[in-house]
Each structure stands twice: as C-alpha cells, then as structure tokens.
Amino acid sequence: MKIVFWGTPKYAAENLKTIAKAGYEVIAVVTQPDRKRGRGKKLSPSPVKEAAEELSIPVYATNSISKDQKTKEILLNLKADVYLVVAFGQILPKEILDQPKLGCWNSHASLLPVWRGAAPIQWSIINADAKTGICIMSMEEGLDTGPVIEQESTVIKDSDNLEILTNRLSVMSSKLLLKSLEKIKLTKGLNKSSRLKQLNAIEQRNLNGIPSYARQITKEDNLIDWNQDARKILKKIQGLYPNAYTLYNGKRIKILDAIISCDNNQSKESQDIKNQSKSNRIPGEIFMINKQIGIKIMTNDFPVLIKYAQLEGKKATDSYTLSIQSNLSINDKLGI
C-alpha cells in the first residue's frame, strides 16, 4: 500500500515516523515550505520535512497545493493508494482528494464535530473542555466534515498545557492511524461508498457534540486581559503555551506557568479572601512578591500566582527572578 503523507509541525512528524517504522511504504511527503523561525529568524525546514529526510522519503513543499499544478501532476503520477493528512495547514482541493485509490484520510485532534478547523487543541484548553481526542475521518471538500472511522478520547487534566496535551494526542493519533490503515487496506477494489460502509464510518451529524470552529490563533489572542476571571486567564496561559504574555513598561513578559491562588470550590474563608481582594485591588495589580512562592496578580475574581515566566530578551525563569529582572514592585500594574 503506497502512502503519501501530508503534514507540517512536530505533532505530524511523530505520526510520520510511527507509520514509516511500522513498515508502511511512504512514497512521498508533502509539507509547507521552509520558514524563518526562532530568535535569529533563520530559514528552517518544517519538522515533517526533517523527519522525511531522516527516513529518505522524497519531499515536496508547497505554499498552496490548490495553485501548484506541478506538484499536483507529480502526485498524480505517483499513483498512491492512500493520502494521510495530519496538521498539513492547507485545505486540499477536490482534484487532490480524488487522486488516491483507497481514499484521503485525516487525523484530526478533536472529538468531531467539536472544534473543526486549524487550532483544535488550543481551543479545547482555552474553553476548559473536560475532554478531547482524535478522530480519523474520510476527507471531503468541507472543513473537517467527513465521516469518522475511528475515535479515541482523553481527559484534559488541570495541569495540561498545549505542549503536554499535544504530545499525548500525537501518540494517540499515531496509534489510531495504524489501526485505521490495517482496516483501509482491506477495502481494495471497493468504491468510496462501499469502502465507508465496510469501515463502519459514522456521519458527523450522528456523533455527539455541537459543531464548532477552532479558528487559527492570532498574535492578538496571546495578550492576557487581567480584567477576565482567573480561570479564563489560566486556561489561556495553558492553551497558548508558551506564547501568552502580558506587558510591563512596554516590554513583553510571557507567562509560562501559573495557578489560581484561591478557587471557588474552596471554603468560605477563600470566598472572604476573594471579596477582600476585589475590594482592595485592581485587575493586573501585583500584590505579593515572594522568593519561595512567586508573584501574585489580581484578576476580576481570584488572584493568579505566577510561577514561571520569561521577560522579553531573557531566558525563562522563576517569577521571583523575573521580578528582579523587570524591577517589579508591589502595587505595580501589569498589562501596560
């Protein structure tokens, strides 16, 4: 079974490695072009391209597969049996979807139809969802609307940030793709309708969940608004890790790890602390700097305790060291 793998980030690269090491014949990889990355803005290949080169698999990079006639023709001539798509970053046109004999399949990191779109992992954390997962679906022209042949869920832990959850989902995705490929290869000779029937594909309208859209994350999304509730701020910090930031004297401070100092499931004493804090403090105000504990900042309800952070131009550090680097003081206000 000849496979063309489509993907771009590290998440997808791990899937590619798993499939190749399982003995499947990956005849080509399609990915996004090299981009400028990191502090030095050095031109670097995508993680999927790096993985493909390590595996000696031919790589084709394209800015827009819809407009890239040359790559389309190359792929057509490869006569692949299956296209596997994992976080590629572009919508595939119908002429591409129709090329492989055994179909075009996507591993999507959500419990469809919830969080269709480009950033499902981020939004599942930001939205404080109880769980998320992986769906393997047959691709069609709609955005992540195809019938699902495999699904697996995982609980989103309170301690999960984007990196931790992404790594866990990548492992789940790799396993589900292998399971799916074993079934897909048995559908040789069937048309699409018969193939989906044999694979017990389920239309998304028959799955649990209300359709929602996980739009691409923008630079503006990363800015923390201290006027929001503490839990909402915490979920943004976790869901956008390591990019959520605040401002102090015009400089960016990335907040890498934080906890809510008091939550609304605690005792009446905690509620009294909340009420006292709200009456005496304003959102964004620093009201504790402690070497052992960290920095406490007021929000719309409960204080947030910053544990690790990174000042613009500096390395990540504990928040007390950050307070020295940034010359932070009690009663200073973040977000300006």
From Swiss-Prot:
GO terms for cellular component: cytosol. It comes from the Bacteria. Keywords: Protein biosynthesis, Transferase. It catalyses: L-methionyl-tRNA(fMet) + (6R)-10-formyltetrahydrofolate = N-formyl-L-methionyl-tRNA(fMet) + (6S)-5,6,7,8-tetrahydrofolate + H(+). Its EC number is 2.1.2.9. The keyword Transmembrane helix does not apply. Coiled coil: none annotated. It is an enzyme of class 2 (transferase). Pfam families: Formyl_trans_C, Formyl_trans_N. GO terms for molecular function: methionyl-tRNA formyltransferase activity. Belongs to the Fmt family. Attaches a formyl group to the free amino group of methionyl-tRNA(fMet). The formyl group appears to play a dual role in the initiator identity of N-formylmethionyl-tRNA by promoting its recognition by IF2 and preventing the misappropriation of this tRNA by the elongation apparatus. This is Methionyl-tRNA formyltransferase. It comes from Prochlorococcus marinus (strain NATL2A). The lineage of its organism: Bacteria, Bacillati, Cyanobacteriota, Cyanophyceae, Synechococcales.
